Structures are given as C-alpha cells and as structure tokens.
Amino acid sequence: MSIGNIVQCIGAVVDIEFPRDAMPKVYDALVLEDSGDASFAEKGLTFEVQQQLGDGVVRTIALGSSDGLRRGMEVKSTGAPISVPVGHGTLGRIMDVLGRPIDEAGPIASDELRAIHQKAPKFDELSPSVDLLETGIKVIDLVCPFAKGGKVGLFGGAGVGKTVNMMELINNIAKQHSGLSVFAGVGERTREGNDFYHEMKDSNVLDKVAMVFGQMNEPPGNRLRVALTGLTMAERFRDEGRDILFFVDNIYRYTLAGTEVSALLGRMPSAVGYQPTLAEEMGKLQERITSTKTGSITSIQAVYVPADDLTDPSPATTFLHLDSTVVLSRDIAALGIYPAVDPLDSTSRQLDPQVVGTEHYEVARRVQQTLQRYKELRDIIAILGMDELSPEDKLAVNRARKIQRFLSQPFHVAEVFTGSPGKYVPLKETIRGFKMLVDGECDHLPEQAFYMVGSIDEAFEKAKKLQ
C-alpha cells in the first residue's frame, strides 16, 4: 500500500507521484487520504490510473469532483482495480459508479466484490441465440424483432423518444420476462432516473432491478466507468446461469465522457474531435455484453445521434456491434406518430424466414414495400396532387397511410401525457393486423381509425364510432 502525492491537477485528470519502486498498475484504484485540513475536497475521492508517465508519476482520472484538490495532497494506492458489490444484494438498490448506495436505504447487503475491468468471454464460450423476444410494440415486433440474448440499439436525435421507448420496453419486457434486469444510467437526466425508480416501484418489479447511475451533472470519470459498473453486475447474474436484461441509457454519453478526458490524457483527437481510441473503448464494453453457454444478457441501449447524423463516428461505431437497430425519425415524430420508429431504416438480423417464419417475413417485407412506394410517390403528390396517380398507385398510397398510422401505438409509460391507456399487442395479432392491411381487407376503413390503437379489431371498432 504505497502513498503518493498529487503533482498536477487539470480538471478531471490528476497526476500523482509515487516512489519509483511502488508505482500502481494501470486501472488500479487510488484513494485520497483524509488530510484533516479545511479543504473541501471530496473525502475518500477515488482515482483510476490510466497511464504511467515514468519517474514514478501516474496519470489518473478522478471518479468524483476534483474541486478542492491541491498539489502535495496524499493519495493511497489500493493495489487493486475498482471493485463493486455484485449479487442479489444489489437488487432493488440505486448505486453510483463505485457501487456505493445513493438511495439512502442503508449499506448494500453483498459480501462479493468484483473488479469492473473483466476480459470478454472466450469465443468457444459464446452461445448464439435465435429465440425471439416479444416486446408488445407492433412496429418493433414486425420490422426489427429482438432476439433473446441479442443486442439492440435505439438510435435517435434529441427529443424523438429514445428514453420513452426504452421505458416502455422495460415496462413490457421486465414485467413479462419476470427475470432480473440491470439498468445503467450513463450521463442522462437525473429526473429520468427518478421517474424510472418510481415507475419500477409502482409496478412492483423494483426487487428484480439493480440500478447504477452516473448522471449528466457528474464528472466525466464517473460517466466513463458507470456502464462498466452496471455490466459487471449483469455479468455476475449471467455467470450463475440466469437470463439478464441490461439497459443502458445512453451509450453516446459513455463515448462523450471518453472524449472529454482524452485530450487531457494527452491523446491527439481524431475525426470530429473524438478520442483516437473510440473503436477500442466501444469494443471493450460491447464485447463483454454477450451471451455464454451459462446464461444470457439481452441488452437494449439508447444511442443519441448528434445532429440526426447517423454517419457521426460515435453512432457509426455502435452500429457494428448490434443485432437489431431501431431508428427513431424526426419526420415521423413530426407527423404525430409515436413510437417514431422508421420502418424503412430499422433493421434486424432476426428478420429472416428461417427465424421468424415465412408469414411474418413476407408481411414485414410487403409492409416495407408499400411504405417505400409511398415514399417514392410523395414528390409527385406534392407537385401534381393525388389525381395524377394511376389507380394502383392511389391504392398503394392509401394503404401506406393506413399502415403508417397503424404503426403508432399508445404506451403504458406515456398514459400520464396522452390520457389513453397503453396497449400490449401480441406478435400474432400484429402479423394478423398488417396482413389484413396489405391484403386490402381494410381498404374501406378511414385512415383515422388506425391512429393510436392496439390490435386491428380496435381499428374496426374505432371506424364504427367514426361513421
């Protein structure tokens, strides 16, 4: 247990000098000694070693506020990486990046600690999965179905509904799935974390969820490591043979925290100012989120898209790791259609006749073809009007507009705002409804009948009321 002294402090990055024969290893945790003076530095502040600069100096990231630090302060090496409590004691609790409780409900009842830096499972331990995970959200189940043990990304710009979609997925899957979930809040609004906690409490599933938060107001060191803390807890449950749900909101903030400290660590920035280690950092996290022969981790990650540009390096790097991508579109949100999922842009490896079955595959593809035809005709309609279209095209446009409205759905978590009760639509009902639409069995119904309903039967009932 060697003791060093702070020699330089630039924001979240702190250089600490140790005796040359007792330098801490990379990723070791260091703790600020209580100096007893009137400094307002955070007591027990933890640092994580990032680089060894030579001459006994190590460069570290402060996992907490560096306010009040000064040169000469004593820092003790723990000789081990950051370790957090894991196991059943974490369920129903809210923790920070270091696994300390922040819900004022006493200490975490767990004897087992695990380092947040772990190796990804070996290739021969991995277990591919083709079982479908029903979400009860029509557009997702139809066009971009999720796999159990798969990885899903919710892509969208600011304010198109990533968090609401994720909350609805948690609401539908965590309740139906009855397994354990881990939620990592990375650099998001504290209010959303609070809403999530109360949502889980009100629906009586709090005892099945472990929550880890490093929110917007916290230093970059916390936001950079909080995803790993949550993942470590999820891995522990997976390794005891369970099927786990792992939610991350938002993976972009993880990248951004890395960008914030990258320049301070002395790295040259790469494209758009991102850290040069972007792909490696993302790979380290994503390769650990995987299913093994022992248990599975199904992960759902919200990904913020800066300026709605999907080619930005951060979302583009995330794309590589996912099985299903749900792309939220501002144009669809502008039409008032929620969830604002773009059915032409969203993809899934599971949308394969050998996985989902021929009927599901054909209905999904026919829905996409109809919507694509409407997209192509939109310019003609804008310039010349509907009257100039051929009868076949008019029919395609009418069907596409009904499909577009039928892809909307009232959410349970949005009941407070919309005033209409949420709907969970089973996969069979979803396929039946869209099959009737593309087969022309609903051509006589008005468009409004399909907006914000659950199953196709509700659309028929709504049509009767509209007449």
Swiss-Prot record:
Entry EC no(s): 7.1.2.2
Origin superkingdom: Bacteria
Pfam families hit by this protein: ATP-synt_ab, ATP-synt_ab_N, ATP-synt_VA_C
Keywords: ATP synthesis, ATP-binding, Cell inner membrane, Cell membrane, CF(1), Hydrogen ion transport, Ion transport, Membrane, Nucleotide-binding, Translocase, Transport
GO cellular component: plasma membrane; proton-transporting ATP synthase complex
Compartment list: Cell inner membrane
Any one GO molecular function term: proton-transporting ATP synthase activity, rotational mechanism
Recorded catalytic activity of this chain's protein: ATP + H2O + 4 H(+)(in) = ADP + phosphate + 5 H(+)(out)
InterPro entries (alphabetical): AAA+_ATPase, ATP-synt_VA_C, ATP_synth_F1_bsu, ATPase_a/bsu_AS, ATPase_alpha/beta_chains, ATPase_F1/V1/A1_a/bsu_N, ATPase_F1/V1/A1_a/bsu_N_sf, ATPase_F1/V1/A1_a/bsu_nucl-bd
Subunit (UniProt): F-type ATPases have 2 components, CF(1) - the catalytic core - and CF(0) - the membrane proton channel. CF(1) has five subunits: alpha(3), beta(3), gamma(1), delta(1), epsilon(1). CF(0) has three main subunits: a(1), b(2) and c(9-12). The alpha and beta chains form an alternating ring which encloses part of the gamma chain. CF(1) is attached to CF(0) by a central stalk formed by the gamma and epsilon chains, while a peripheral stalk is formed by the delta and b chains.
Role noted for this protein: Produces ATP from ADP in the presence of a proton gradient across the membrane. The catalytic sites are hosted primarily by the beta subunits.
Family membership noted in the UniProt record: Belongs to the ATPase alpha/beta chains family.
Protein name (database record): ATP synthase subunit beta
Native organism: Cupriavidus necator (strain ATCC 17699 / DSM 428 / KCTC 22496 / NCIMB 10442 / H16 / Stanier 337) (Ralstonia eutropha)
Lineage, highest ranks first: Bacteria, Pseudomonadati, Pseudomonadota, Betaproteobacteria, Burkholderiales
Gene: atpD
